[in-house]
């Protein structure tokens, strides 16, 4: 049951900007979030492209810190991401990659920094969060999820897969 009255349709808060005008894309404060990816995570392919496209409207760059993953220019273009604003740092060692992500987030030169990093300690996560807040940037920690899903499978599934391995 609703106890408070509905606001009238002319409420200036609701209609403060035209519907076609996008919301501001500069976060008031930065943050770091973990995103799981893998064959069993199709939702990521629906969420990530619009986010990258919207962040591409900013004057800032997008940085991908990757171990082996290379963003496809064709895929980025098809998603509407401005490829001329995407930079990639490849083959950084784990410690260097964490440090690079921290410095990139803190600089404020990047709207988003995507990092394919090993699992982080609580102290490393805290450092990245503080850096993101200082630079008003978004940090996305990309984590593979296939192993976690297999571990969550019922015991019968593990027994059926005993003795076989799948390599990518």
UniProtKB/Swiss-Prot annotation:
Marked site (Essential for degradation by Lon protease) residue numbers: 168
Domain of life: Bacteria
Keyword ATP-binding included in the entry's annotation: no
UniProt keyword list: Cell cycle, Cell division, DNA damage, Septation, SOS response
Family matches, as SUPFAM superfamilies: P-loop containing nucleoside triphosphate hydrolases
Processing and modification events after translation: Is rapidly cleaved and degraded by the Lon protease once DNA damage is repaired.
Induction: By DNA damage, as part of the SOS response.
GO biological process: division septum assembly; DNA repair; negative regulation of cell division; SOS response
Coiled-coil intervals: none
Subunit structure: Interacts with FtsZ.
Function: Component of the SOS system and an inhibitor of cell division. Accumulation of SulA causes rapid cessation of cell division and the appearance of long, non-septate filaments. In the presence of GTP, binds a polymerization-competent form of FtsZ in a 1:1 ratio, thus inhibiting FtsZ polymerization and therefore preventing it from participating in the assembly of the Z ring. This mechanism prevents the premature segregation of damaged DNA to daughter cells during cell division.
Family, as annotated: Belongs to the SulA family.
Name under which the protein is recorded: Cell division inhibitor SulA
Organism: Edwardsiella piscicida
Lineage of origin: Bacteria, Pseudomonadati, Pseudomonadota, Gammaproteobacteria, Enterobacterales
């Amino acid at each position: 049951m609703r106890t408070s009255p509905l606001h009238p349709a002319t409420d200036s808060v609701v209609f403060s900007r035209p519907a076609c005008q996008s919301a501001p894309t500069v976060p008031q404060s930065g943050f770091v979030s973990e995103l799981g990816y893998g064959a069993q995570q199709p939702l990521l392919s629906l969420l990530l492209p619009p986010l990258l496209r919207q962040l591409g409207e900013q004057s800032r760059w997008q940085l991908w810190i990757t171990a082996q993953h290379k963003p496809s220019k064709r895929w980025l273009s098809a998603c509407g991401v401005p490829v001329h604003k995407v930079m990639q740092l490849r083959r950084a060692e784990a410690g260097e990659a964490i440090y690079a992500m921290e410095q990139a987030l803190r600089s404020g030169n990047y709207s988003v920094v995507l990092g394919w990093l090993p699992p982080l300690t609580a102290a490393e996560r805290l450092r990245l969060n503080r850096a993101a807040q200082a630079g008003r940037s978004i940090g996305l920690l990309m984590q593979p999820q296939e192993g976690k899903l297999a571990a969550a499978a019922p015991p019968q599934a593990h027994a059926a897969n005993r003795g076989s391995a799948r390599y990518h």
